[in-house]
């Protein structure tokens, strides 16, 4: 289970953390019009890797939850468009994504189309989506960067206050 309290702690920690950024891997054919910057926080492959140097013990313990498959800080520059897509099966298990918005410059110009319906974010309020199953696209049409922590969890994980 991932609690709202856990997500709030991740949000508060993320707001005061400076993340070392790198360019997200480019997917063949491209999935967006601009470079997205990321800082990985947790990865699961042959072994579990957590970027403990960036974290307090409390945050490390939250990310140690085996229901969390992957986590990253993501920065979408102004004018970024993420084209319509479903996320691929990149883990051994099906997953859903917890989006934790850190900085949303403008809810009118920063949004997601989820199955054709407009969804907006509020900073610090998480939303959960089965990104493998539904076509979605994202927009930052504002003049400032939009920032999130994205947390991929096993599909059957209970996420408190799941949308």
PLM regions: where:
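Intrinsic disorder/low-complexity detector
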Residues: 35, 59, 87-89, 138, ...
């Amino acid at each position: 289970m991932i609690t709202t309290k856990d997500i709030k702690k991740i949000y508060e920690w993320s707001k005061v953390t400076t993340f070392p950024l790198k360019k997200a891997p480019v997917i063949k054919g491209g999935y967006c019009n601009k470079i997205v910057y990321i800082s990985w926080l947790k990865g699961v492959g042959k072994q579990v890797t957590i970027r403990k140097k960036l974290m307090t013990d409390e945050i490390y313990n939250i990310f140690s939850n085996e229901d969390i498959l992957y986590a990253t800080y993501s920065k979408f520059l102004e004018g970024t468009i993420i084209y319509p897509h479903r996320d691929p099966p990149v883990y051994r298990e099906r997953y859903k994504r917890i989006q934790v918005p850190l900085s949303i410059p403008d809810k009118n110009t920063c949004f997601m189309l989820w199955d054709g319906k407009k969804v907006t974010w509020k900073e610090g309020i998480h939303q959960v989506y089965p990104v493998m199953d539904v076509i979605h696209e994202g927009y930052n049409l504002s003049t400032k960067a939009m920032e999130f922590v994205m947390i991929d969890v096993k599909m059957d994980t209970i996420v408190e206050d799941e949308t």
